[in-house]
UniProtKB/Swiss-Prot annotation:
Function, in words: Plays several roles during the time course of infection, including egress of virus particles from the perinuclear space and secondary envelopment of cytoplasmic capsids that bud into specific trans-Golgi network (TGN)-derived membranes.
Biased composition (Basic residues): 230-245
GO CC annotation terms, alphabetical: host cell Golgi apparatus; viral tegument
Family: Belongs to the herpesviridae UL51 family.
Binding partners and assembly: Oligomerizes. Interacts with ORF55; this interaction mediates ORF55 incorporation to virions.
Subcellular location: Virion tegument; Host cytoplasm; Host Golgi apparatus
Main localization of the protein described in the UniProt heading: virion
UniProt protein name: Tegument protein UL51 homolog
Keywords assigned: Host cytoplasm, Host Golgi apparatus, Lipoprotein, Palmitate, Phosphoprotein, Virion, Virion tegument
Region Disordered, annotated ranges: 225-245
Short name of one Pfam family: Herpes_UL51
Source organism of the structure: Equine herpesvirus 1 (strain Ab4p) (EHV-1)
Entry comment on modification after translation: Phosphorylated.
Length: 245
């Protein structure tokens, strides 16, 4: 109190004032409740056990934890969207440098998303707390610069802290690239073969699947009667001959 009084009399103000959290009363501020519901929806989509507004507003620590968790959840969703967009890239020999850049971005985005998810789980489901490393992760997640080497170095530290295996991500990306290459090869073979050619090849003019069309030069032959080897028991009747008078 005395320090505050002396600083006020001398005109000295503390520029780095600590954050102040006011208690939230449900129904008093609709905008605040809407932001809380939006944050809970983003976080509950990744947590196995859903949180409620009562859990969040019960203490200032829970509110601060929700703010960190919302940033981690938004970053995870953004990384997943980037991975989905980058996976549509078709690797080609025309621009090999672009293929390497896309692969690097996919690996970094996958590592960042896995780290955000693990930090979020550790924030709510672990017994201990890693507030320092989580705060660092949140600061980097806000900047969203996964391609930066400094950020990826901090991600590597968090991976070691949270027990993640980045090599598994690289192997998964290699398997995805292999499956994409096989699918592209199958599609290329399918495009080279025309379905109409297959029909004409399997059902030609002489194919039993189609009726044979006669040309103008062919002569239609009348089938001759087949002589039977069986002898009839009845005697053939003789025709009456005409006698000229």
């Amino acid at each position: 109190m005395f320090k505050w009084l002396m600083s006020s009399l001398c005109g000295i103000r503390n520029s780095t004032s600590p954050e102040v959290y006011e208690p939230i009363i449900g129904g008093q501020n609709p905008a605040t409740m809407l932001r809380l519901q939006s944050a809970l929806a983003a976080v509950n989509a990744l947590l196995p056990a859903t949180l409620t507004i009562e859990d969040v507003i019960s203490s200032a620590d829970n509110t601060r934890r929700l703010v960190k968790a919302q940033t981690l959840a938004r970053t995870y969703q953004a990384c997943q969207h980037n991975i989905e967009c980058l996976s549509r890239h078709r690797a080609s020999s025309d621009n090999p440098n672009l293929n390497a850049v896309v692969t690097t971005h996919m690996i970094n985005a996958k590592r960042l998303s896995d780290t955000c998810l693990a930090a979020l789980m550790h924030l709510y489901l672990s017994v201990g707390a890693v507030d320092a490393t989580t705060d660092t992760m949140v600061d980097h997640a806000i900047r969203m610069t996964a391609e930066n080497s400094v950020v990826m170095a901090d991600v590597a530290v968090l991976e070691k802290t949270l027990g993640l295996d980045p090599q598994a991500t690289v192997r998964a990306q290699d398997l995805l690239a292999l499956n994409s290459g096989v699918l592209n090869s199958v599609n290329a073979v399918a495009e080279m073969t025309d379905p109409t050619d297959d029909v004409e090849f399997t059902q030609s003019v002489h194919s039993p699947l189609l009726p044979r069309q006669l040309s103008t030069t062919e002569v239609v032959g009348v089938p001759s009667p087949v002589k039977s080897n069986l002898k009839s028991k009845h005697k053939p009747k003789r025709k009456a001959s005409l006698v000229a008078v």
